Amino acid sequence: MNIRFGLIGFFVAGLLLIPPVIPNEVDSSYFHQALDLSPRAERLSEEMLSNKLVKGFGTHPLVAEEFSGWIYEASKRHRIEAELIASLISVESSFRKSVVSHRGAVGPAQVKPKHWQDFCGNNDLYDPEQNVYCGAMILSYLIDRCQGEYGCALSAYNVGFYGDRWQAGKRYIAKIDRSLDALQNLAL
């Protein structure tokens, strides 16, 4: 007997023993069950990110829980890895909500209202949730502008495109990389 046909027969026999997942009559309750999988999966992803923030950065659990929802939503909106956004926020503000830099950057993502207020749709950049969304929007824009080169985008996020602060940009990229490694190498 050919092994390939033997495996196919085993697979078909296994299918006959498994109860069908899709009901014979598809009613509205089936669709509700299917739609509930997505929010459940999102909650699980947010919880995993929250745990990573606690273990990887030492963030207080309540702060991690709050930020993980915002970060996860921002990552979906702007198609950026949630761990990258979390690393940026960790480096920029250590998840402090109302921090203001000596250069006028505000909030967890350290957004400069003078430069980015209009770009982010005149959101209240002092609101930490809106600040996280705006920071992710800026990073997404910079990634596009840098043609997908994350080092270029992160350096531009920190020091801009022009000027002679390229060494500071390199140090910033190294900090983000260390933070990102801390999150990605966690065993949960």
Regions found by a protein language model. Name each.
Residues 4-21:
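Hydrophobic membrane-insertion alpha-helices, especially the h-region
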Residues 24-188:
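Catalytic glycan-binding domains that act on GlcNAc-containing polysaccharides
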